[in-house]
Amino acid sequence: MSPLTSPLVADDLEIVRRLLAHIDAGTTDDGEARREPVGNYLDPGRFADELRMLRSLPSVFIPSAAIPNPGDHVERVCFGTPLFAVRGSDRRARVFRNACRHRGMALVDGTGCSHALVCRYHGWTYRLDGTLAHVPHADAFPDLNISTRGLVEVTSSEVDGLIVVDALDPDAAQPSLRAFADDAMAALTEGSPWRDKLVPAQRLLLAESAVRNINWKVLIEQFLEGYHIRSTHRETFFPLQYDDLNVVETFGPNSRITFPYRNIERLRHRPESTWTTKQRMTFVYQLFPNAMVATFPDLVIVVVVDPIDIDHSMITTYTVATPEVAEAFLIAAAQQDGASTVPTLLERGVLEDNEMSFGVQRGLRSGANAFVEFGRHESAIGHFHATLDQRLALLTATHST
């Protein structure tokens, strides 16, 4: 596995310096412009290649906060494969293919907590480490070896607040593809720059999944630039944030985009030793291929986008917070008869982004454009697409040899 250099992104003080300089100069971080062919969003053959590529790479499965205690489990369909994660009695997180070894019944539905995993169909029972513990009327299965019929585990790692699954495609085990997957795993687990932002957020406030009639890449693009703040979020984020003012950093296939709040200017006349980014900015970490970690003053949101087909995606959002903040939110929600624990402003902002992405999806089929235009202030999107093209080319070359 190739070691990654550290630090991978600028420290908080340097980010503040760069942002204040941009405010003074009326500038933002520049990168390369890019034109992405519309056909890359609409071609079923291209989508099939992308899905094959995604299944050959490690990816973020869930935040650690989704299963904090022994027995906690949660399921998700990852690139078309039903999986679930469970925290064992040894506190280790494991990920399994979501199927009983009897008749293939999905073992876990949604979230829960239990001392054992019991199939609702015929009662086959598994320990939290996946081993098969009990089969009703086992004498009816003369060829069954209980010791070898445990759940099928998917290789995973738990690092810095995230549970990451290894490649799901069996072909990824080939030597020619293993180095490819190992480098991708390193980019998600070694020296992770989101560590200090995500690890303290140990409590899950909310987990939501929804199918959107939007291509998976369009959904990811909506997180990666601040050029739209004034137009899209005029009454939500724009009064608090700057339009078209970001710091953009890349580390391997990943990127970090910093969105400053207007109150950052209060730091100008304070000693640098007192500077803090808390309450001053949002960091969005795009973790290739399909996850985002976004920090807000009191919350962290982990978003995972699963492609379904060229026009549909499943977007799963986990909202996590520190124990102190989570307790305050839960008390407030109880006082409001179970109202959402996510601030209304943030909810409205997400709805606005989704509305714009749905509009893009509709426009892609209009025939008006041969390509989508990304400007120099949208360079994190360009980095995402360039990385995607590079990984597709590597995979194609490997399969053709």
Task: Please identify what each model-predicted range represents.
Residues 14-44, 105-116, 193, 235-265:
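N-terminal short leaders/motifs
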Residues 3-5, 86-87, 92, 98, ...:
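C-terminal catalytic domain of Rieske-type non-heme iron oxygenases
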Residues 55-56, 78-79, 113, 151, ...:
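Short, well-ordered loop/turn elements at secondary-structure boundaries
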Residues 61-69, 145-146, 280-285, 318:
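Short linear motifs in intrinsically disordered
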Residues 56-66, 135-140, 284-289:
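Short Pro/Gly-enriched beta-strand edge/turn motifs at strand-loop
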Residues 2-110, 155-157, 179:
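N-terminal pre-ligand scaffold of iron-sulfur
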Residues 40, 45, 64-65, 71, ...:
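Solvent-exposed, flexible loop/coil residues
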Residues 67-183:
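Rieske [2Fe-2S] iron-sulfur-binding domain
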